[in-house]
Amino acid sequence: MSGKLTHIDQTGAANMVDVGSKDETERQAVAEGAVRMKPETLALILEGNAAKGDVIGTARLAGIMAAKRTSDLIPLCHPLMLTKVAVEIEPDENLPGLRVRALARLKGRTGVEMEALTAASVTCLTIYDMAKAVDRHMEIGSIRVIEKSGGKSGDWAVSDPASMR
């Protein structure tokens, strides 16, 4: 990994990286996050009794939609033709709360880490929004990339996925 910031030019100004000369390769990234909540809140969500409706289904769709809009939210991200976005939401009674995993994939010239991170983040934010009326003490955290593949820098994965849980 290079120690150089690619979005900063020689004068220190932010710029969008020119990826036009890069080869198109299959690229994928997976990000995760978690929403910690009261056990009663988790039960309410899992039973489908939240006042705003289907929390898990709505949050999953919000994450997918967010990945597709990443370049509208993050100033120097390229608009990408994603070929796959998937969001998984799993209950974790030990947290207690919901764990989120988001995958983004494409064949292109730049990575999809930001799209995976955006999907995971917005999924967590949507869970919070839909359950905040019953639990204002929810906590969003552990949002990070846990694996990526493709591109010039090759494949990478967190060596201990549980290290930040």
UniProtKB/Swiss-Prot annotation:
Substrate binds at L76, C77, H78, M114, E115. GO terms for biological process: Mo-molybdopterin cofactor biosynthetic process. Pathway: Cofactor biosynthesis; molybdopterin biosynthesis. The keyword Signal does not apply. It catalyses: (8S)-3',8-cyclo-7,8-dihydroguanosine 5'-triphosphate = cyclic pyranopterin phosphate + diphosphate. Homohexamer; trimer of dimers. Belongs to the MoaC family. Its EC number is 4.6.1.17. This is Cyclic pyranopterin monophosphate synthase. NCBIfam families: moaC, PRK09364.1. CDD domains: MoaC_PE (cd01420). PANTHER family: MOLYBDOPTERIN COFACTOR SYNTHESIS PROTEIN A. One of its GO terms (molecular function) is cyclic pyranopterin monophosphate synthase activity. It is an enzyme of class 4 (lyase). HAMAP family: MoaC_B. Catalyzes the conversion of (8S)-3',8-cyclo-7,8-dihydroguanosine 5'-triphosphate to cyclic pyranopterin monophosphate (cPMP). Keywords: Lyase, Molybdenum cofactor biosynthesis. It comes from the Bacteria. Pfam families: MoaC (PF01967).
